[in-house]
């Protein structure tokens, strides 16, 4: 009699639902998954090693490219680690700007997650809506840094520059006539803060639109409820953080439990799931949209009323203004040294973590007193989540793996590093 064997199948890395370069080796009994083995490393770029040969400031753009949909949140952990070693005081205005952009980044990340997750499961409309709404936030990125994605806006000691007083305007073209262009420029007449405030007024309506399309949708619930269930104890044992941990009912958020910057002065809530399945994690992230919106509004109000410096006045770390540089020899020397040699960080080691859109993103930095790190270790939240994919997908169908990869919000830049 013929022996019945399990069937081995490769899922990805060319599969559209594999989120980049994920290769899964699935062991199947019929269509039921017995084992899922993620193969990683296809996007390994040696970021940790490269950082050892770059000055501290030169590594900031590398951070953007780790989780390349949560750019500024990555930078934040890195500059916080440097500030801890240097014992730098960050101006309060810079702290508010950072928090505001961290939350803008959270919305950017969750919009991409929602669009991709829905598209994987088969809902096309949400994907188009989400990308329509990301556009405004990308413009906010562009107005402060000149780049829509890889901003390199945070600096040790503050941020690169203050918020601009005017927004870039659309110009009429063959595709968009004068009338359409005028309508598109309507909310761009004021400063960046006016533009962001206008977005925060509109955004709750957008979130309601997503909920109308998905939350009570029968197909959506059939594909998500009871899939990839993780108990609170297992979630903690597996090293889950962020929405993956909160979806299992554990109220852990670094913004509340280990506050950094000005989070302890802001009013917001931590959404927590009940069942620990894909649907609960969806609901947690949807509520995070609303809470991030609340935080951004509070930051906008504060930033309007409180002008001030946005980067430290210690010219050993931050460059002097161009006006001073052209009038004073000492400032010119500071400027020259900063951009040739960089600044030296006292010997020591530190760990700085932020509540990244995907979980706890941490940077462990060791300095030997030179102008480059002796060692930099990146603690990527997605790495622990992907490691649990095997446990989460056992006993489910192949189609459910797609929903589980979606709910984990996998981005390979940070996993392979």
Swiss-Prot record:
One of its GO terms (cellular component) is plasma membrane. The keyword Cell membrane applies. SUPFAM superfamilies: HydB/Nqo4-like. InterPro entries: NADH_Q_OxRdtase_suD, NADH_UbQ_OxRdtase_49kDa_CS, NDH1_su_D/H, NiFe-Hase_large. It comes from the Bacteria. NCBIfam families: NuoD, PRK06075.1. NDH-1 is composed of 14 different subunits. Subunits NuoB, C, D, E, F, and G constitute the peripheral sector of the complex. This is NADH-quinone oxidoreductase subunit D. It comes from Nitrosospira multiformis (strain ATCC 25196 / NCIMB 11849 / C 71). The lineage of its organism: Bacteria, Pseudomonadati, Pseudomonadota, Betaproteobacteria, Nitrosomonadales.
């Amino acid at each position: 009699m013929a022996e019945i064997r399990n069937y081995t199948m490769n899922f990805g890395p060319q599969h559209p639902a594999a989120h980049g370069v994920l290769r899964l080796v699935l062991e199947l009994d019929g269509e039921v998954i017995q084992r899922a083995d993620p193969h990683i490393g296809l996007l390994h770029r040696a970021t940790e090693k490269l950082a050892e040969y770059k000055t501290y400031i030169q590594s900031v753009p590398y951070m953007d490219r780790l989780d390349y949909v949560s750019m500024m949140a990555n930078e934040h952990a890195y500059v916080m680690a440097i500030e801890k070693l240097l014992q730098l005081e960050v101006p309060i205005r810079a702290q508010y700007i950072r928090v505001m952009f961290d939350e803008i980044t959270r919305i950017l990340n969750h919009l991409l997650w929602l669009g991709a997750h829905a598209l994987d499961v088969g809902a096309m409309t949400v994907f188009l809506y989400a990308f329509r709404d990301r556009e405004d936030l990308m413009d906010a990125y562009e107005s402060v840094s000149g780049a829509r994605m890889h901003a390199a806006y945070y600096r040790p000691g503050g941020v690169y520059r203050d918020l601009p007083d005017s927004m870039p305007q659309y110009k009429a073209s063959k595709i968009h006539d004068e009338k359409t262009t005028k309508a598109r420029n309507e909310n761009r007449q004021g400063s960046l803060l006016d533009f962001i405030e206008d977005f925060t007024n509109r955004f709750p309506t957008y979130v309601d639109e997503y909920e109308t399309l998905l939350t009570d949708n029968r197909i959506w619930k059939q594909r998500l409820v009871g899939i990839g269930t993780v108990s609170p104890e297992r979630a903690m044992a597996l090293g889950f953080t962020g929405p993956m941990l909160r979806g299992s009912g554990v109220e852990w958020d670094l913004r509340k439990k280990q506050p950094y910057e000005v989070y302890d002065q802001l009013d917001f809530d931590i959404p927590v799931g009940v069942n620990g399945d894909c649907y609960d994690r969806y609901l947690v992230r949807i509520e995070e949209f609303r809470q991030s919106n609340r935080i951004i509004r509070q930051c906008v109000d504060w930033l309007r009323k409180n002008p001030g410096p946005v980067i430290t006045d210690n010219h050993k770390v931050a460059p002097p203004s161009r006006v001073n540089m052209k009038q004073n020899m000492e400032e010119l020397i500071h400027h020259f040294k900063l951009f040739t040699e960089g600044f030296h960080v006292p010997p020591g080691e530190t760990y700085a973590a932020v509540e990244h859109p995907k979980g706890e993103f941490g940077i462990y930095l060791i300095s030997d007193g030179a102008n480059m790190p002796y060692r930099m270790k990146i603690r990527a939240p997605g790495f622990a989540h992907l490691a649990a994919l095997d446990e989460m997908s056992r006993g489910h169908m192949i189609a459910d793996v797609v929903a589980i990869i979606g709910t984990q919000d996998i981005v390979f830049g940070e996993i392979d590093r």
